[in-house]
């Protein structure tokens, strides 16, 4: 299996024109299509894996260009930003120490995201429980966080980890999943920031959908529940190929 990973415009090692008008979901969908064409991938060999924000992109791409995809992998992303926000508010926040949550909320209310206290609380009380549960984070995670484009992240996601408040606030394709006819696996993990039961429901809405739960993982379950994640992913690809 050949795995191709690319940095989108304004991300990682790609150019960053610092033009916020380019921070647009439809444009990013066309970027995926440009990469596909350049690599000469098609329905015979193209599996699209989208994780987190990439899951939003993968769903949107499939709704427009599914004729080009052999298989779709939606990893750790719900099909509704409002439902994600609801889960963050009603479930995730209640798992946190109330005093810690109050401090985080106060910092967010004051837009004081650069305060060292903010990440100082988020990392042990949220990231280490719901983003990656390994005691020492793998180097690629640290590297990707070090290269984050904060302007882009805040523009699309919003500054807070508790739900989406940026351009994607009202994004919701839950009613359109039935239109994605491509074989699809929906992957989630017990400790993810996403709602595992909602993700399971998503798989039932896809005509050729299946669900994979990583019981010990979180948002980056390809690291913290790697055996289950990779075995399930490879099994899906082999099943579609055959």
Predicted stretch roles:
Residues 44-87:
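Conserved hydrolase catalytic core segment
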Residues 174-217:
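Conserved loop-alpha-helix segment in the C-terminal half of the alpha/beta-hydrolase fold
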Residues 95, 102-178, 182:
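Alpha/beta-hydrolase
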Residues 208-242:
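Catalytic active-site module of serine/aspartate enzymes centered on a nucleophile-bearing elbow/loop
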